[in-house]
Amino acid sequence: FGFDFDTTMIRIGLMNMILHGIKKPHMTYLDSLSKQNEIKEEFTVILANPPFTGSIDKDDINDKFSLSTTKTELLFLELFFRQLQAGGRAAIVIPAGVLFGSSNAHKDIRKLLLEKGQVQAVISLPSGVFKPYSGVSTAIIVFTKGGNTENVWFYEMKSDGYSLDDKRDKIDGKGDIPDIINKFKTD
């Protein structure tokens, strides 16, 4: 399943799923944060790289959100948490500010994830990993819905296998990714 309100991204997403062997790809035209989102399904896995450092008009925000904010990066995290079934797992790309922000909404989303979920890992990504599209410092947060957090595995990725400038030239195409996978599996 996938949702987007950009038809070009929907076409790209569908083609990507087909190329990766998904027989019946499903993507829907939907602004996930808006009042039009009436998706009730709960998912076992959510992988997402939502748009961040944006905001949404307060009048357009779905009434189901408990966070008092218009910041999309926080609203998406709450949405993903809510749409996971108990025991479901998510890996979400977030701006690093989500981890350290001091607003009440930042504190509330961290409290939700830590106390009503199990945050397993925070993987800090190198600055420039999303260039030329974004220079925002980012991380991947991995969590499960349910329980509470006891230990969090942290990893500071130095390289994703590509140059961190605007050209993003291939270095080895792997960087720290094999090490992250190996260490995350064993921890």
Regions found by a protein language model. Give the residues of each.
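Conserved SAM-binding motif I beta-strand of class I
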Residues: 1-4
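Short alpha-helix immediately C-terminal to the canonical SAM-binding loop
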Residues: 10-12
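Conserved hydrophobic residues forming the short capping helix/wall of the S-adenosyl-L-methionine
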Residues: 17
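Conserved SAM-binding strand-loop segment of SAM-dependent methyltransferases
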Residues: 22-32
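A conserved structural/catalytic subdomain of Rossmann-like adenosyl-cofactor enzymes
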Residues: 36-187
